[in-house]
Amino acid sequence: MSLAPWDIAICMHDIEFFTWRRTMLSRFQEMASAEDVFQELQFQTQKLEFDYYSLCVRHPVPFTRPKVAYYSTYPEAWVSYYQQHNFLAIDPVLKPENFSQGHLLWDDALFSEAQPLWDAARAHGLRRGVTQYLMLSNRALGFLSLSRMSAREGPIAHDELELKLQLLVRESLNVLARLQHEMVMTPAMRFSKRETEILRWTAEGKTSAEIAMILSISENTVNFHQKNMQKKFNAPQ
């Protein structure tokens, strides 16, 4: 039984994808520097017919102002404008509630509560975009965002684009983790021996008075160390 033309096209498309996948996995395994990762991402961004990309990691600490690290090929004018207007605070792409979707297309609905950001992005030539999310082993959130200056739909189907972005963000961050790049490493939080003891008993649900009795210190000393730890966590006091 012969295959119909469209069946042949589907088979060829699948073969091309898995060939690309094998090539990419091999390439990422051979990377020896962060620059290798960043250059490959730009190359793949253009192959997918986008213009710019941003690789971002949002760490879970400090709790009230989580550390955000990124590498971007966006125009410097846009990066400066974004920072000057503190768009980080309203960017829906970075909101944890959107992370569960995994694959996020940029559209009017997504930016409905961040209209100034959406208007400014388009004014700077960023008219279409997509973001792929990934949870890292240290509970940090990884984001790979691609954008283009053209408002037209890209030639690549959304399901294929999603599969490729899943691989790109996963392998990129895996390489950076292997290299122990600062972008993916959890911010260091150093505690004294006494602070560690108090933190452990606090996690057990003990009150300041109970911890004071257990450690044979005053309750004021316990409260003093707890306030110091709150500052390190950047948590509200």
What kind of feature is each model-predicted range?
Residues 135-150:
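Sensory-domain boundary capping and coupling elements
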Residues 194-198:
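The N-cap/first-turn positions of alpha helices
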Residues 117-139:
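Helix-to-coil/beta transition segments that act as allosteric "coupling" elements at the rims
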Residues 2-26, 34, 148-192:
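Juxtadomain coupling helices with adjacent low-complexity linkers
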Residues 207-237:
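Recognition helix of helix-turn-helix DNA-binding domains
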Residues 72-122:
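Regulatory sensory and allosteric helical modules in signal-transduction proteins
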Residues 57-80:
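GAF sensory/regulatory domain recognition
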Residues 22-26, 34-46, 118:
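Short amphipathic alpha-helical segments
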